[in-house]
């Protein structure tokens, strides 16, 4: 796995995570049948990163976009917890420019926009298991070209804290 500055940090055990959002996602990932937790990290800014492998993704034999049946992702939770946890596809050759990818000042890792709902609107009822399922849904639907509604213009956002439609 390639190292990316945005998710690099000191490796920590999952049981040593400190941020409530990271802890809930870590625990949900451990219980999820399609997820294997590979590692956890703490960055110098206090954010925490969970590296996971998603498996048994529902990818057709000839996908619309080159998405694999297994994909590695990183979920980064910020200390302030004001925005949706950041989700990155961390495969070295993961395609850029897919629908519902966030425009960032770097090409890789690819930042995924997994929800078009503002985090402030869902934060009170945030469910880590549902969050993981949204990520899986992103891969499954993008692989068949159905993540983005037909006839709806793509919206480009240049900051991960915005939402995409």
Walk through the language-model features, giving the residues of each.
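Long, charged/polar, low-complexity intrinsically disordered N-terminal extensions
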Residues: 1-66
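Compact alpha/beta protein-protein interaction domains typified by the UBC
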Residues: 39-115, 126
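Glycine-centered motif in EGF-like
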Residues: 95-152
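A glycine-rich phosphate-binding loop feature that marks nucleotide/adenosyl-phosphate handling sites
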Residues: 152-158
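Extended, non-transmembrane interaction/recognition domains
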Residues: 158-165
